[in-house]
Each structure stands twice: as structure tokens, then as C-alpha cells.
């Protein structure tokens, strides 16, 4: 059994070697038409790396010619499927600018915005790329209000906005974690005001209550009563807005 597997692996390695060797010869070939034909074949077979490499080589040769539109779109799409989102976004945007009346322009515009979406990092990192992605997707939504991709674009925008909200919430919550309650109250209040419909509002209200309560009970006598009143207001808002809050027992214990 092992001998059969080893033979299969050997044959596959030989095939791969000659296949790679043939592709290298193709890259050195100066016949642009042959490269174009092979790029199309690789594209049809979803061999995105080879297709994108060939399309990149021949794209300048066909600029301004009828084939240029098809090559640019296929090149961009190959990059997208290869997950090279930075270069794919650039190529799709170039397509939109170069071929504004193409039947593929709407698809290219969405794909460009989608590439920016894919560049959005996790919430703990800088969110400049997320802001750019939201802007690009919103531009698509505004320009193509009847697009078949409208719902998907809106969903992507919502997802990115929630990511920004979560980052803002985590920053605000951090002040509570390090027991800087004065700053926590200020930042959590700002968060709740800025994002009234956020899915993290319940959590923000609890940590606002906790910060207000901790600040009050650790205050000097002259400030304690007023600060306790403020904490009670936040507690009542939490319980009224979320009567089955996951923080009910913890909040009730502090109030007692």
C-alpha cells in the first residue's frame, strides 16, 4: 500500500515539475496571443495564480484595444480569487474608471468595495482601513441604489460599523477595568450617546452603573450621596430598558 502511495506521489511530483517548467517557458514566450489564450484557459480552470500572472504580463499590450476591457476585469477577478485584495481593489477601480459604460462596471464597483471590506482588520487593531471600507461600500450603495448587491453591501457596512462600535465599547470598558471610574463614566456616557442603537448598549449601561457605583462608595462623604443618586439613575435605566438583563443579579447585589 505504501509503495503505491509513494509511486502516486512520485508521479504527481514529476507532473508538477514539468507543469511548472512549461509555465515558466510560457512566461518567457514573446507571443502575446498565446499568453492571452493560456490566461483564459487558466482562468476557466480557476488557476488564479497563473491566470493573474499572465494577465498582468499582457495587460499593457492590450491597453486601448477591444480585448483590454476583458483582460482588465479577468485580471482583477483573478487577484480577488487569489485573495490579493489590495491589488484587486486597485484593478477593479481602474476598470471602473477606464470602462464606465461596460456591462461589468457595477460588478467591478462592488468587487472593489468588497476588497476594501476584506482588508478591514480585527477590532483590536487600527481601524483606518475599516473606515475606508465603509466609505467605499457606501459610495457603491449611493451610486447603485437598485443593485442586486445592495442588500449584501448594506450588510457589510453594518458588520463594519458594529466592529467599530465594539472597539469603542472595549476602549470605554477598559477604563472600568483599570478602575479609572471618572474617565469610565465620561467615556461610557459618550459611547451610549454616540451609538444609541448599538448591540453593546446593555453592557455599556452596566459598566456605567458599576463605574458610577464604585466612584460613589469610594468618595468622601460630601460627594457620596450625589454620586449614589447618579448611580441609581443608571441602574434604573438598565433595569427599565433591559428587565431581563444578564447583569440583573450582579446589579441587584450592588444596590442592596
Name these PLM-found stretches.
Residues 4-5, 16-256:
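Acidic, polar-rich low-complexity tracts and alpha-helical solenoid repeat scaffolds
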Residues 1-9:
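Bacterial N-terminal signal peptides that target proteins for export
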Amino acid at each position: 500500500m505504501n509503495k503505491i502511495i509513494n509511486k502516486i506521489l512520485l508521479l504527481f511530483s514529476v507532473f508538477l515539475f514539468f507543469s511548472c517548467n512549461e509555465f515558466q517557458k510560457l512566461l518567457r514566450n514573446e507571443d502575446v496571443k498565446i499568453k492571452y489564450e493560456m490566461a483564459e484557459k487558466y482562468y476557466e480552470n480557476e488557476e488564479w495564480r497563473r491566470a493573474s500572472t499572465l494577465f498582468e504580463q499582457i495587460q499593457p499590450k492590450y491597453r486601448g484595444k477591444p480585448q483590454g476591457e476583458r483582460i482588465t476585469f479577468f485580471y482583477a477577478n483573478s487577484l480577488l480569487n487569489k485573495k490579493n485584495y489590495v491589488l484587486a481593489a486597485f484593478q477593479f477601480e481602474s476598470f471602473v474608471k477606464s470602462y464606465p459604460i461596460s456591462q461589468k462596471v457595477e460588478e467591478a464597483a462592488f468587487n472593489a468595495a468588497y476588497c476594501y471590506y476584506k482588508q478591514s482588520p480585527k477590532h483590536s487593531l487600527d481601524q483606518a482601513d475599516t473606515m475606508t471600507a465603509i466609505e467605499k461600500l457606501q459610495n457603491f450603495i449611493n451610486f447603485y441604489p437598485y443593485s442586486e448587491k445592495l442588500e449584501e453591501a448594506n450588510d457589510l457596512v453594518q458588520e463594519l460599523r458594529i466592529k467599530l462600535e465594539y472597539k469603542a465599547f472595549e476602549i470605554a470598558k477598559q477604563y472600568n477595568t483599570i478602575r479609572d471610574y471618572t474617565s469610565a463614566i465620561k467615556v461610557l456616557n459618550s459611547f451610549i450617546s454616540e451609538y444609541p442603537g448599538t448591540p453593546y448598549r446593555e453592557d455599556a449601561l452596566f459598566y456605567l452603573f458599576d463605574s458610577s457605583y464604585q466612584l460613589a462608595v469610594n468618595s468622601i462623604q460630601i460627594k457620596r450621596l450625589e454620586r449614589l443618586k447618579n448611580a441609581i439613575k443608571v441602574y434604573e435605566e438598565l433595569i427599565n430598558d433591559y428587565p431581563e438583563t444578564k447583569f440583573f443579579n450582579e446589579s441587584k447585589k450592588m444596590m442592596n
